């Protein structure tokens, strides 16, 4: 079988060029012949692009780069169209491969942008610790606070902080003193009076200290709200003094503590509440127990290679490259030509996509493999981890000295020993924390549990979330049950959590490419950007444009969901993101050739035997077939046609929600901004296919009955494998594994080996195939099995929160989940197997060289398909999903453009495509 690849066979459109000896200098021809044995040029100069051979760096070389300013702009709410006039002077050749659009504008990433995990404000505070606060109960003010500053005395003017040069008392400036960051510097001082601190009034709504921020209102850092005086001309701070003494005091009521109470502009810029008591009002004693959590990180940047920014489609918004003499447009795009995906796969074939290149915004979408597939090998916590008090002692008591009279009588020793000695008895006081287990548990919650499907999450009590589930506020407010994916779930196994298999793993804050692209723009919401965007359309991205005057125009989208990417995938339109283009210029390069060299090149390229031909790298008609929610079978019918030059099928599955309508410049139903597999190649639903059958309209089976399984049917995975047809400790069949190795790497029945590195890059099947297995309790043979549901399971009880990320509750008690699968008391178990294969597309090769897909006979193969047309029926069996999806099929065809520039200012393009000549698979 011929090796299928994304490039079609060149023999279908051979480009006839002159022999090198006809136009290269005699010296170069002689050099080539003399060195041919060890430096072979081959037919390098038979290509339509002829390299300059002399006079390259002389004073007659042209200037390298020119800037073209648009002659016309047309801006709407959804797009920005620019038109350029490209004037290519005599003896010059414009290199379209080097052109790029230079775009300047302003980007507002919206309030949902959060480029970090955790909080920037009081991140060391316990999640449930309140700010020092006051509240009113039965018309009396209650205070809960801290007084860290120790002054010299307290009067009705407040706390004394020092003395001036005249030895007069200086009292705290209540606009900013006492400062909350200043207190006692030694652990061994335990003052009982003259203490001062700050506290928030009951008119400032309570919230936890974790994540609290109040802007300063003076240059000393004070935060008290400014209030206007009666004359409304000046503003002052309204800070009150609250004096206290001990509750047991009955006689001397001089103050021992003063709290400076104030109202501040309290905010929580990057946190939200996950526990809120049910009380009326914004200040109450119960609200001291509120608990905060950080807002979820949401990186927002332009898509990889600026996917979605330029508009590629033929329905009314087509790009234009036309000679002004002829006005024939060289750009003929088709609705089924996927320019963006083609460019992604081409870059992968050319080099290593894991290397980022900032100029073209090249930073490919990725995910942390430890998040997609969890290797839960437990934690190494053999040694306990302790924390100790600052004094490094146990709990101390006060002791006085005693002495003996050299006998058995003891008496008080107050002559040379203090009467107040702090002595601890026993071991040093300590508290233990299992750091390793807590870090692992926190990793699982932040990286996996919070990304569970929404149906697995809950809304905390007394928290109101918006109805629109695509908003950041809704996604951010929902919480997962930590015990659903705790350290003991699937412990010892390498397994992806089943609910996560169908969740887009690229919509994650560990998408390193998106994080890089987001950080290229900075860490603020408002960004004045200046970007360079390359042309990707295959017919013009490598074109040599000969002298003449040309019209070049293109549309740029302004839809933030299409041109921006967020790690949460929220609806950026609703969440307040916007983009404004201020200028779009075109930068173009001329070949640095001497004029006589350029004129020779022009004369050659004007000849129709040297027309420039370009292949679309993907070379495929791509079709989307809807799969309704919970459907398991997808039939496809292709009308009768000649299948010459057909190379096979590639297919995968997409979510309808994640696939925009490319036919319109603005898709109102595209309420999503995560990765778009249809355009960027972030496929992740390949594991949901069960089998596919291929039937041509004949009685002859294809691809023959010499395979392991049924002719006409490719079985992808088997749940029950009685015959042993599965492979690699998973449920993929040997048949399908061999077909993938054959179609991707030409590694067929001659044995198994690793494909060459240049074929095994980011979108490779071999690199992304991930088999896995685990054991679970056999509920039929284990007679004592009880189906204990999540609310009734307990493990780490008393040390963790219950059914949510809130404060720990309960008591220490033996765990009742999970059942042991190891050791002396291991319960009966079953083995489950599955696989994941992201990024790649399943492929079925079809060799149009054979043209005989019949059964093998002693007469050789039946020439059934040689020159006749046949219809095709395909049926895909898939796993049901609870949302509408799309079957994405690439019919690998032959897609070439041949560009002819016979005269000045004339450009003609001929597009050849077979077997799908027009824009869809029905013609």
Curated annotation (Swiss-Prot):
Matches recorded under InterPro entries: Adenovirus_Pll_hexon_C, Adenovirus_Pll_hexon_N, Adenovirus_Pll_hexon_sub2, Adenovirus_Pll_hexon_sub3, ADV_hexon, VP_dsDNA_II
GO process terms (BP): microtubule-dependent intracellular transport of viral material towards nucleus; symbiont entry into host cell
Residue positions, PTM Phosphotyrosine: 911
An example Gene Ontology molecular-function term: structural molecule activity
Keyword Acetylation applies: yes
Function: Major capsid protein that self-associates to form 240 hexon trimers, each in the shape of a hexagon, building most of the pseudo T=25 capsid. Assembled into trimeric units with the help of the chaperone shutoff protein. Transported by pre-protein VI to the nucleus where it associates with other structural proteins to form an empty capsid. Might be involved, through its interaction with host dyneins, in the intracellular microtubule-dependent transport of incoming viral capsid to the nucleus.
Family per record: Belongs to the adenoviridae hexon protein family.
Protein name, per record: Hexon protein
Organism the protein comes from: Human adenovirus F serotype 40 (HAdV-40)
This protein's encoding gene: L3
């Amino acid at each position: 079988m011929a090796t299928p690849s994304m490039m079609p066979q060149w023999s279908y459109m051979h480009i006839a060029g002159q022999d090198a000896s006809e136009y290269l200098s005699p010296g170069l021809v002689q050099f080539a012949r003399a060195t041919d044995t060890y430096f072979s040029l081959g037919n390098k100069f038979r290509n339509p692009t002829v390299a300059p051979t002399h006079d390259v760096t002389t004073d007659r070389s042209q200037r390298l780069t020119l800037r073209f300013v648009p002659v016309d702009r047309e801006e709407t709410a959804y797009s920005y169209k620019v038109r350029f006039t490209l004037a290519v002077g005599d003896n010059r050749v414009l290199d379209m491969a080097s052109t790029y659009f230079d775009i300047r504008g302003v980007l507002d990433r919206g309030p949902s942008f959060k480029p970090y995990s955790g909080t920037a404000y009081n991140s060391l505070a316990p999640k449930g610790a309140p700010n020092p606060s006051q509240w009113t109960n039965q018309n009396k003010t209650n205070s809960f606070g801290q007084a860290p500053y120790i002054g010299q005395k307290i009067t009705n003017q407040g706390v004394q902080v020092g003395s001036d040069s005249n030895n007069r008392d200086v009292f705290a400036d209540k606009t900013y003193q006492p400062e909350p960051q200043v207190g006692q510097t030694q652990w061994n001082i335990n003052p009982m009076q003259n203490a001062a601190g700050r506290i928030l009034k009951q008119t400032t709504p309570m919230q936890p200290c974790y994540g609290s921020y109040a802007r300063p209102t003076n240059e000393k850092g004070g935060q008290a709200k400014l209030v206007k005086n009666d004359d409304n001309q000046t503003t002052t701070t309204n800070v009150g003094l609250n004096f206290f003494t001990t509750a047991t005091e009955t006689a001397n009521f001089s103050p021992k503590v003063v709290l400076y109470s104030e109202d501040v502009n309290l905010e929580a810029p990057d946190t939200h509440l996950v526990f809120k008591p049910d009380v009326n009002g914004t200040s109450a004693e119960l609200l001291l127990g509120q608990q905060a959590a950080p807002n979820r990180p949401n990186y927002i940047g332009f898509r990889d290679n600026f996917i979605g920014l330029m508009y590629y489609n033929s329905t009314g918004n087509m790009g234009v490259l036309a000679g002004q003499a002829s006005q024939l447009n060289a750009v003929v795009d088709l609705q089924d030509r996927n320019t963006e995906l083609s460019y992604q796969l081409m870059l992968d074939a050319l080099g290593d996509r894991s290397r980022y290149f900032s100029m073209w915004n090249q930073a490919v979408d990725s995910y942390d493999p430890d998040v997609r597939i969890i290797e839960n090998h437990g934690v190494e916590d053999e040694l306990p981890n302790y924390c100790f008090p600052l004094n490094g002692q146990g709990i101390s008591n006060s002791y006085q000295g005693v002495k003996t009279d050299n006998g058995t009588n003891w008496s008080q020793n107050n002559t040379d020993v203090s009467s107040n000695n702090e002595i601890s008895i026993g071991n040093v006081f300590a508290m233990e924390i299992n750091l390793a287990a807590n870090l692992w548990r926190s990793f699982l919650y932040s990286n996996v549990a919070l990304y569970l499907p929404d149906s697995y999450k809950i809304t905390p009590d007394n928290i109101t979330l918006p109805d629109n589930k695509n908003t950041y506020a809704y996604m951010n407010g929902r919480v997962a049950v930590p015990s659903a994916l705790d350290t003991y779930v699937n412990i010892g196994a390498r397994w992806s959590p089943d609910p996560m298999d169908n969740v887009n793993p690229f919509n994650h804050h560990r998408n390193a490419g998106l994080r890089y692209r987001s950080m290229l723009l900075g860490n603020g919401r408002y960004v004045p950007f200046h970007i360079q965007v390359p042309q990707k359309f295959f017919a013009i991205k490598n074109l040599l444009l000969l002298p003449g005057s040309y019209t070049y125009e293109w549309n740029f989208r302004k839809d933030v969901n299409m041109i921006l990417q967020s790690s949460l995938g929220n609806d950026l339109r609703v969440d307040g993101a916007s983009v404004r283009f201020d200028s779009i210029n075109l930068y173009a390069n001329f070949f640095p050739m001497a004029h006589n060299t350029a004129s020779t090149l022009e004369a050659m390229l004007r000849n129709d035997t040297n027309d420039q031909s370009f292949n679309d790298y993907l070379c495929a008609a791509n079709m989307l077939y809807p799969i309704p929610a919970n459907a398991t079978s997808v039939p496809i019918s292709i009308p009768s046609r000649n299948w010459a030059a057909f190379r096979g099928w590639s297919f995968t599955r997409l979510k309808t929600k994640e696939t925009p309508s490319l036919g319109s410049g603005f898709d109102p139903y595209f309420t999503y901004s995560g990765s778009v597999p249809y355009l960027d190649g972030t496929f992740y639903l390949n594991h949901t296919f069960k089998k596919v059958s291929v039937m041509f309209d004949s009685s002859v089976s294809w691809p023959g009955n010499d395979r392991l399984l049924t002719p006409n049917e490719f079985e992808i995975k088997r749940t029950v494998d009685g015959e042993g047809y599965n492979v690699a400790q998973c449920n993929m069949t040997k048949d399908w594994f061999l077909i993938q190795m054959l179609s991707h790497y030409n590694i067929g029945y001659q044995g198994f080996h690793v494909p060459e590195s240049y074929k095994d890059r980011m979108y490779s099947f071999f690199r992304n195939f991930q088999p896995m297995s685990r054991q679970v309790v056999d509920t039929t043979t284990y007679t004592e099995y009880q189906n204990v549901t999540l609310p009734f399971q307990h493990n780490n009880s008393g040390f963790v929160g219950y059914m949510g990320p809130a404060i720990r509750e309960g008591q220490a008690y033996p765990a009742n989940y999970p059942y042991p699968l190891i050791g002396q008391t291991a319960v009966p178990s079953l083995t489950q197997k599955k696989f994941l294969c992201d990024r790649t597309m399943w492929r079925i090769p079809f060799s149009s060289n054979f043209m005989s897909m019949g059964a093998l006979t002693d007469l050789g193969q039946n020439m059934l398909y040689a020159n006749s047309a046949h219809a095709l029926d395909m049926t895909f069996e898939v796993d049901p999903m609870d949302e509408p999806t799309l079957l994405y099929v690439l019919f690998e065809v032959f897609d070439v453009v041949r560009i002819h520039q016979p005269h000045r200012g004339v450009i003609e393009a001929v597009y050849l495509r077979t077997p799908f000549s027009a824009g869809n698979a029905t013609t």
